């Protein structure tokens, strides 16, 4: 996936739905995609029929549609985050073990995950912060990070304390090594490649302002 020829800018920071719509727009036609728990699930609401994207959910379904509302809600039809969803024509259901075979076997073009930290080299930390009430095991995110051809991350750029989640080196336990290719935040989209971290788009801030927040060299498409 190539970078844009020039830096794109927007005057306002993005909300959660706007960010999800941006991620949906960037998913290539015909892709097989897994949407992780949390913010990434919103992406399903913005995919178009013309994109012909097939959504996979870890609990055993291909052909997942947008989030269910009103009379669409079926308590037995949920995604991995236990959110009621819809099914599209041709949807299929299968055992959890078969679902993980899809994840581990390289059959997913993209997975979209949340994160606590992403490093300058694309390492992903999204399962444990060391907090006493944190979940005790890594879960399926490890399989997705390893098995998907591309890993997109959706996250806020800063923690509640104002620290950057995009870091030179992750300090939390890793979910995957060198797996993240794009990071979508409310302030910017970052591309992670061999040359470093490139700012593709900014929202409500400048590249110089980003450089004051993120503790690493940031490139732009122009250099």
Task: Please annotate each region the language model reported.
Residues 60-65, 160-161:
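Short gly/pro/ser/thr-enriched loop/turn and capping motifs at secondary-structure boundaries
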Residues 38-40, 59-61, 116-117:
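Short, ordered loop/turn segments at secondary-structure junctions
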Residues 51-60, 220:
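Short hydrophobic/aromatic-enriched beta-strand-loop microsegments
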Residues 1-32, 41, 45-54:
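N-terminal glycine-/serine-/threonine-rich phosphate-binding loop
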Residues 52-54, 66-70:
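Glycine-rich phosphate/diphosphate-binding loop of Rossmann-like nucleotide-binding domains
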Residues 2-18, 69-223:
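Conserved phosphate- and dinucleotide-binding cores of soluble alpha/beta proteins
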């Amino acid at each position: 996936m190539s970078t844009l020829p020039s830096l794109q800018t927007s005057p306002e920071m993005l909300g959660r739905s706007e960010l999800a719509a941006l991620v949906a727009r960037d998913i290539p036609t015909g892709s097989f995609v897994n949407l992780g728990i949390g913010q990434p699930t919103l992406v399903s609401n913005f995919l178009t029929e013309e994109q012909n994207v097939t959504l996979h959910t870890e609990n055993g379904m291909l052909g997942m549609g947008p989030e269910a509302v009103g009379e669409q809600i079926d308590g037995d039809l949920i995604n991995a985050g236990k959110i009621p969803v819809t099914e599209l024509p041709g949807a299929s259901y299968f055992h959890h073990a078969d679902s993980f075979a899809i994840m581990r076997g390289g059959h997913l073009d993209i997975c979209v995950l949340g994160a606590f930290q992403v490093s300058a080299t694309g390492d992903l930390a999204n399962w444990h912060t060391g907090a006493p009430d944190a979940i005790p095991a890594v879960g399926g995110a490890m399989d997705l990070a390893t098995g998907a051809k591309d890993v997109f991350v959706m996250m806020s750029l800063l923690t509640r304390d104002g620290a950057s989640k995009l870091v030179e080196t992750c300090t939390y336990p890793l979910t995957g090594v060198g797996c993240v290719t794009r990071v979508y935040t409310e302030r910017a989209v970052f591309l992670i490649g061999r040359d470093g971290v490139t700012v593709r788009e900014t929202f409500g801030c400048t590249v110089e302002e980003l450089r004051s927040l993120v503790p690493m060299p940031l490139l732009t498409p122009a250099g």
